[in-house]
Amino acid sequence: MSDWNPSLYLHFSAERSRPAVELLARVPLENVEYVADLGCGPGNSTALLQQRWPAARITGIDSSPAMIAEARSALPDCQFVEADIRNWQPVQALDLIFANASLQWLPDHYELFPHLVSLLNPQGVLAVQMPDNWLEPTHVLMREVAWEQNYPDRGREPLAGVHAYYDILSEAGCEVDIWRTTYYHQMPSHQAIIDWVTATGLRPWLQDLTESEQQLFLKRYHQMLEEQYPLQENGQILLAFPRLFIVARRME
């Protein structure tokens, strides 16, 4: 599991794209020229940006070679760069930085967010959506299984929180719109939940394990999911998925 799997990621493309659609709807810009899609993945969010601003120069950034290859194939009119978000520098100041479900993987948000704001033109917008599910059973159980099986903690850190991000971005000279939403995704089985998180949050826990260790981990994880996520009357499972949204406009 050394690289991201675009096919597995896109298995839930509608559910993953919905937050991007709702984030984009809150971006208060009519005309933009330069746009960066940070953590563009296979290009599903980049496609939304291109649909809204077909004349814009859009650059997608991702550290995964597989994701970049998929995005280039899907959107040949956009530019895609394989790079670390923290180190990438645009050639010119940007009108919009769009980051859908990517910045949660990076540390030091107290430094990262002001840095991203500095890449914007005056009146430019930083639009961010991050999963806020560190305390949800899906992610708590990852840590519990790893502890049971004596594996090191490989999960990401929790988000800084609404009040912290408001202060960070206000102090960086932004007008801030911030909100939190919980989606309830209908899952047909507990295995479907595993399929979902295997493409994202579970990757760090599995990537250094042998095949037999992965099987043991996933078997125990499945057992614990069954205890935490009961079936609805129709046999479906409701997967609660909180997400944090930020639209910050640079006022300086």
From Swiss-Prot:
EC number assigned by the record:
2.1.1.144
What InterPro entries does the entry give? Methyltransf_25, SAM-dependent_MTases_sf, Trans-aconitate_MeTrfase, Trans_acon_MeTrfase_C
Q: Which GO terms describe its cellular component?
A: cytosol
Question: Organism's domain of life?
Answer: Bacteria
Task of the protein: Catalyzes the S-adenosylmethionine monomethyl esterification of trans-aconitate at high affinity and of cis-aconitate, isocitrate, and citrate at lower velocities and affinities.
Hey, which family's this protein in? Belongs to the methyltransferase superfamily. Tam family.
Q: How does it assemble?
A: Monomer.
Could you tell me which NCBIfam families the record lists for this protein? PRK01683.1
Q: What is this protein called?
A: Trans-aconitate 2-methyltransferase
Instruction: Report the source organism.
Output: Escherichia coli (strain K12)
The gene from which this protein is expressed is: tam
